[in-house]
């Protein structure tokens, strides 16, 4: 089952409420704190995602129960990656839009 999780937008300046995710070398806000479920993301130059489409364009994120199952048949741009303890993510294009699937265990 897929459920809308957030809209990820790129920023190049610090945003109030952002936290550091060391595993990905990014700063990000929590979409749970935004009424429109927006996640602001800022990439450090050393981020493994810095030179990928993930760091260059917005994405729509869907929470999924089983990431591996949902990714079957998808041509991945990035991932799957361990974003945080218990959180796995992967990105792919769907009709020209960048999509993130996110699994929380």
Residue map of PLM features:
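Short, Lys/Arg-rich amphipathic alpha-helical interaction segments
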Residues: 94, 98-105
